[in-house]
Amino acid sequence: MHYYRYSNAEVSCWYKYLLFSYNIVFWLAGVVFLGVGLWAWSEKGVLSDLTKVTRLHGIDPVVLVLMVGVVMFTLGFAGCVGALRENICLLKFFCGAIVLIFFLELAVAVLAFLFQDWVRDRFREFFESNIKSYRDDIDLQNLIDSLQKANQCCGAYGPEDWDLNVYFNCSGASYSREKCGVPFSCCVPDPAQKVVNTQCGYDVRIQLKSKWDEFIFTKGCIQALEGWLPRNIYIVAGVFIAISLLQIFGIFLARTLISDIEAVKAGHHF
């Protein structure tokens, strides 16, 4: 004798299409990041010679853009298809990945707070290694220039850090026109100049240190960032909380949809 149980369980269309809409944003953002990253690599000729990435001593910002794009594209695809096809495997992958990213972000934030000296040393090493490669990659160059201009700083701990770069080095072996100078992004802006003077940092470090602050920023970028964080702690905290809430919302939608699908499948087995 066979027994049957009729279940009223059904998959909620509300959660299903809400999760789909949530993930379509991820997917489209991932496509944009990947498109921008591949376009940037194409402009630099990296796509025709991938060894250019490994030859760069610093970090290529495009790599970070592509990594973010791959993660967002993959998660968005898994979430969209998983929701539309009611695929438990893809939904669990999406949910698990979001949970992992959430706890990684939380761990990084806690560790960065507890080990501030270690983070400061790693950032110094990172900044100095990228100073060495300043002229080797246009995207890296623009990133450093933006950082220095936005924070009115120069080098990791000061202008002398630019001695690490072969073009700005003050040694007698250097024949660069930029010898003993700094990038234009270190220069104190002149309100009277409407056009950026890209040569304003030439020969600045030949002069007495006491006169440097008349022409360039003398504060290091590590010190500038350490001062920036307390002033903007509420903004940083607000962004972190907003991202966390979005992730928790995505996890909730995925888990709810998984439960609905499992309930429907369980009802069909009787």
Curated annotation (Swiss-Prot):
GO terms for cellular component: cell surface; tetraspanin-enriched microdomain. PROSITE patterns: TM4_1. GO terms for biological process: positive regulation of Notch signaling pathway; protein localization to plasma membrane; protein maturation. It is a multi-pass membrane protein. Pfam families: Tetraspanin. Its main location: membrane. The chain crosses the membrane at residues 18-38, 62-82, 93-113, 233-253. Disulfide bonds join C153-C221, C154-C186, C170-C180, C187-C200. Residues 39-61, 114-232 are extracellular. Glycans are attached at N169. The keyword Ligase does not apply. Interacts with ADAM10; the interaction promotes ADAM10 maturation and cell surface expression. Belongs to the tetraspanin (TM4SF) family. PANTHER family: TETRASPANIN (PTHR19282), TETRASPANIN-14 (PTHR19282:SF261). This is Tetraspanin-14. It comes from Mus musculus. The gene is Tspan14.
